[in-house]
Amino acid sequence: MDEIKVVPYIPDEDYDNPAMVVDFYEFTMANCLFLHGFKDTTLVFDMFFRKNPDNQGYSISAGQRKLTRFLLNYHFNAQDIWWLRTKGMSEEFCEYLRTYRWKGDMYALPEGTVCYPHVQMVRIECDLVGAILIETYLLQTMNFHSLIATKATRVTGLNTHTPRSVMEFGTRRAQGESAGNDGAYAAVLGGCVGTANCLAEMKFGSDVKAVGTVAHSFIEFFPTEFDAFKAFADTYPDSVSLLLDTYNIMESGLPNLIKLDDYLCLLYTSPSPRD
């Protein structure tokens, strides 16, 4: 048999295919088992965790929505096959992946369900290749979403009788754009009233509503704190959300908020009609 010449792969920073979010050893294992005739063998994998984060009493199972979308759209592109050839995968395996679509079964707790250690969050039943190659993406998606959703229920008090209105503001500290979007979704699932992330609402809809306050720099731009409050309230009278801690909450922020409330009451309260 003639040796197949493999053209060196050219990196592309703009390329993105979630199916390639795979730890490399998944490919080496799948290729080996494929060549030994096990490609049609059905495997069953359960995903569970051994202890709750921070030794708390429960966790929230989340990430099922994104995982389902991933499996429904699972495929490999020509660029993926090209790269796999350069990494030593067999020609037979690469040709198999070229037309491969995920065709297994996924059983999972409903997203947002309370769950506990050693309880299966997700069960996968699939042919050997599909079961092995999705492990990395499955764990990444479920672990991250569940972590954020669980933390959000505690921050918002959703796990108590006195929940609080909390806005998610984590994108600027997230580990990348995808984490910012997924974190916003999971935080709202865990009880947050909205997110500062505009793209999250564009992706997920009004259930993940984009909301916000103002920055300290906005307050400092004006001659006085009250001037800043008034300018914002005049612009957005139906949605006033402000910061009180730019200077001093008790000595400045709160008194100026009360002053603003008096101003808005006079401005927008209609006089009683005369008899």
Give the predicted meaning of each segment.
Residues 272-275:
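A short, hydrophobic C-terminal helix/tail in secreted or cell-surface proteins
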Residues 44-95:
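N-terminal, Lys/Arg-enriched amphipathic/low-complexity engagement segments
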Residues 2-42, 51-53, 88-89, 94-106, ...:
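Buried, small/hydrophobic-residue-enriched core segments of structured protein domains
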